[in-house]
Regions:
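Covalent nucleotidyltransferase
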Residues: 1-125
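Classical nucleotidyltransferase
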Residues: 3, 9-51, 168-223
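Short aromatic/hydrophobic-glycine micro-motifs
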Residues: 46, 123-128, 156, 213-215
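Short, structured patches in soluble enzyme cores that scaffold and shape functional sites
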Residues: 53-55, 80-85, 132-134, 163-165, ...
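Extracellular/periplasmic catalytic domains that process cell-envelope and extracellular macromolecules
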Residues: 72-73, 152-153, 200
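Hydrophobic/aromatic-lined pockets within catalytic cores
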Residues: 85-88, 152, 194
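Amphipathic alpha-helical
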Residues: 130-183
Length: 223
């Protein structure tokens, strides 16, 4: 299974008993999209939905995800690429489960996700959608690279390669691999920009010159 590699915020949503909670990869609760993405996920029914928050650009999504005021969620949506029933989600806390893997295959999980989405298409879902995928049988590297290049030309980061029959793994593993071209560049720093919100008074980002245009770099900065 080949899918585009998204450039957003990893988000795991749990829908249970009429409530929906969205979590970042770190486990931090994301509540700013409850009235948009959260309400639409409730229409899909109980389960665990895995995807990425997408929008105009990564920086703006990050700001809106944790902003406490002046919240603007317009244009932000959840691109889903996996699904787990609640009983399989509980396997993550089962100490007897070897490797903490689930029973449903990658393809079966995605088919269940598509079935839920198709049943609710008449509900006009605007903030939740499934990613596009391509299934290749015994692909060569050239086959995968062709799809990778297509995704990159459409603005994606690269390609995700998934084992058709693999169970869901809680954590990193070889069931899912990524293909991404590495690019580096030496750029002149033209300025320093202050952080916003709780990072006010600290370095927020570097301003650098790229092909004569000033851009900001600093997503990897820490306190």
């Amino acid at each position: 299974i080949i899918e585009p590699k998204l450039d957003g915020i990893r988000c795991f949503a749990i829908v249970q008993s009429g409530q929906c909670q969205l979590f970042a990869r770190s486990g931090k609760l994301i509540s700013n999209f409850d009235k948009t993405i959260g309400n639409e996920l409730l229409k899909l029914g109980d389960g665990c939905y895995d995807g990425e928050l997408m929008g105009d650009d990564f920086v703006s999504i990050m700001r809106q995800a944790y902003r406490k005021d002046d919240i603007n969620t317009a244009g932000t949506y959840l691109a889903l690429f996996d699904f787990l029933p609640l009983d399989e989600w509980q396997l993550r806390t089962d100490s007897t489960t070897t490797g903490k893997k689930t029973r449903m295959s990658c393809n079966d999980r995605f088919e269940e996700l598509l079935a839920r989405l198709s049943e609710r298409f008449n509900s006009d879902l605007e903030h939740v959608q499934a990613v596009d995928r391509t299934i290749l049988e015994n692909p060569t590297f050239e086959d995968i690279k062709e799809l990778h290049d297509k995704y990159v030309s459409c603005g994606f980061e690269g390609a995700m390669i998934k084992d058709f029959d693999a169970p869901y793994r809680f954590g990193r593993g070889y069931e899912v691999m990524k293909l991404k071209v590495f690019n580096d560049a030496d750029l002149k720093v033209s300025g320093l920009l202050e952080g916003t919100g709780k990072h006010a008074g600290k370095l927020g980002s570097f301003q650098v010159l790229f092909n004569g245009v000033e851009v900001q770099v600093g997503s990897g900065l820490t306190d």
